[in-house]
Swiss-Prot record:
GO MF annotation terms: DNA binding; RNA polymerase binding
Keywords assigned: Coiled coil, DNA-binding, Transcription, Transcription regulation
Function: Necessary for efficient RNA polymerase transcription elongation past template-encoded arresting sites. The arresting sites in DNA have the property of trapping a certain fraction of elongating RNA polymerases that pass through, resulting in locked ternary complexes. Cleavage of the nascent transcript by cleavage factors such as GreA or GreB allows the resumption of elongation from the new 3'terminus. GreA releases sequences of 2 to 3 nucleotides.
GO biological process: DNA-templated transcription elongation; regulation of DNA-templated transcription elongation
Coiled-coil boundaries: 53-73
Assigned protein family: Belongs to the GreA/GreB family.
Listed InterPro entries: GreA/GreB_C_sf, TF_GreA/GreB_CS, Tscrpt_elong_fac_GreA, Tscrpt_elong_fac_GreA/B, Tscrpt_elong_fac_GreA/B_C, Tscrpt_elong_fac_GreA/B_fam, Tscrpt_elong_fac_GreA/B_N, Tscrpt_elong_fac_GreA/B_N_sf
A Pfam family this chain is assigned to: GreA_GreB
Gene label: greA
PANTHER family reported in the protein's UniProt record: TRANSCRIPTION ELONGATION FACTOR GREA
Classification via SUPFAM superfamilies: FKBP-like (SSF54534), GreA transcript cleavage protein, N-terminal domain (SSF46557)
Name of protein: Transcription elongation factor GreA
Domain of life: Bacteria
Amino acid sequence: MSKVPLTARGAEKLREELQRLKTVERPRIIQAIAEAREHGDLKENAEYHAAREQQSFVEGRIQEIEGKLSNAQVIDPAAVNAQGKVIFGATVDLVDEDSGKEVTYQIVGEDEADIKQGLVSVNSPIARALIGKEEGDLVTVQAPGGEREYEIVEVRYS
């Protein structure tokens, strides 16, 4: 399996979710299964089947997170000598050449992406267009809504 790039914040969020699933959700579901078993016939016991389905989901998510964390490559953009270039973890201020609107994005791992918070996946069209570019460069992005052109105003590594 290939390395999964994560920011330190993204890795910490995954660790917190894993901890919650193991210490809160797993015991709660085990208790729900035990209570449902006490109600008798398991074939027609909706509570039992719902709890088992939840258990399956939680155990699957635990395995998924453990796999991602074991293959994680935590990247601190401030520690990389990027010399003004856009790299994974960088925060980039852009100006849309058509509308003049300013936008700010941080390039993060798949699991961290949240466009509403300005966090774009390293595999997204905009991140792929930005990687390796520097302040002052114009980039063309093949977005779902058509081609967009942006100017890179500032690149930060925080």
